[in-house]
Structure formats: structure tokens, C-alpha cells
Amino acid sequence: MKKGGLICFTGLDGSGKTTQAEKLLNTLKKKNIDAIYSWSRREPYLIKPIVTLVKKILKESSKSEGKDYLNIKKKRKRRLFKYPLFQKMWISIAIVDYLAKLFFQIYVPFYKGKVVICDRYIPDMIADFAANFDYNNYQIRKLLKNPLLRMFPKPDKYFYIKVPANLGYKRKLDDTSFEYLSEREKIYNFLAKEMNMVVINGTQDIDNVFEKIKVEMRI
């Protein structure tokens, strides 16, 4: 079966990755390249009922994480995530669930020869795990070697749109907390090196950022 292409954008909320992914999609379509856009944030799919139950146990509301991120994280660690066995089990289940979610979004079009422009992908999932479980760099490296990750199509390009947490916070119009972004900023910076991403300064204006992407894509 013919394989297509996979271009992934990753970075903090508020980095502008969605804007750049959409600009790339439009540019490729103008060149008559069969491309599609996939918003691929890891969210509960088959395991949604389990996640809902866990949140009820922890007495969390759907909007509470952004407003009270640090307290919720401490509560999770005290109750469930403090057990290493539970962490490993949960990560494996979540990865398989993510694979199922992406089957029609990425797998099918990719193996039909389309170019899939992915807004969020494996690094964003890893960043969530690392933040939730307070993983250090050594633990993140081990997580990147999880055999289940080999089942994901390998991207042709990883674009990390890099912005500081304070800028991402200013750009966001929802309840995302600064602490949430600050914690993940360090993780993304580490992942960018470990996964050989193309790092682009997202503090520039939109057109300048896209020019850098076009150079990397040779379009």
C-alpha cells in the first residue's frame, strides 16, 4: 500500500501551531498536493467512560484543570498516580486508546497516499504523561522507548513552534494556567532535542514563521 507524508506541528498552547498547520495545508492544496489536516490532540476515545469515572472519584470538573492546575495535580498524585504500576498500566492503555483514535484520522489517509498535516502528535502525548507523573529527563527517555510508540507512523517532519510560557499564556483566551504552560515548556524543549525536531521561533509574526516552514519543506 502506498504511503503518503506526515508533517507534525507541536508546541505549547498559544504557540500558533494550528495557524501554521492550516497555512501549510492551504499552500499544499494550491500546489495540487493531496493533503488533509488532522487535529490530533490526545483525548479519551474508547476509554472516555473510565476517565469520566476517575474524574468523579477525584471530584474534578471538566473546566477545573486550567483554573486550579497545581492543586488538582497534587490530588491526582496523592490518590492514584503515586503508584508506579498504575502509571505504567495507564500509559499503556492511553497509548493504545490514542492509536485507536488516530486510525481513521491519520492511518487510513496516510496509507492511501495523502499528506497528513498533524496538529499535535506523539510529543504532546508524552508531554502530558511527563507532566502528570512528574517525570524527569531520564524517565522521559524511557517513555520514548515504549514499544507501543513504534506502531505510530513516523513523521517526515516535526515542527516545534517554540514560545515561552508567558507568551503562550497571554495568547490563550481560555482558563489555561501559567503553571500548566510553564511546566510543559521545559518538557517540550527537552523533547525537541530528543526527537530531532525542527525548532522554529514562534515569537515572530505569523508570516515570518511560515517562511521558515516553507524553507524546511522546500516549497
Give the label of every model feature segment.
Residues 20:
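Hydrophobic positions on the alpha1 helix immediately C-terminal to the Walker A/P-loop
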